[in-house]
């Protein structure tokens, strides 16, 4: 069977059709393979892997070389979904030339597009230059984790009409610069609805309510890998933490009681 690849143009057309599309993070080959088989439309190698896969405190600690390794692994497991890589902190903020080079490295190892956080005149110019270079860009407004320190923590953005209008203004500028989609993170549902209705590119909700064109979650939250914390806007569809611990305990017991390996499990 021929598998039809999801492209940037596919995502753009979904906006006009009124349908929704799904986005999940993945950080390794097998997870990417399984969620691709499940029909997820966009797979994001999020810089959230800094915390979920590498144990860092924030996304600030992950670098280009690490993101390349994870991107290569994920891309190898995907046949259908659009593969997007989060550009890590300081990989694109210093100068246009190095930013294009770093983004290009992600494309070389298998990404179909990159995601860039924030808004400034520099960012607008960068998006334009990247698109001209042949690198599709997913923009990201609202709460932007790489700006955690300047935003004063994990705070909801766009709570007033003025703040919403400002996000919309920035979003329209990014749209004109060439971004093919926009993540809205931790934005009130009504604000995100207003922004979505006034853009021609699709919006992706990360805690921004149901009226965006797509929803994105971290795969670890969806799978239930952690019991300590789950964001308010996330939904658990499984209990992988309990499953993993149970399997490991049973293996440990079988080893220590001598029941593993059995005669059927040796040469």
Question: What is the predicted function of each stretch?
Answer:
Residues 2-267:
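Alpha/beta enzyme core
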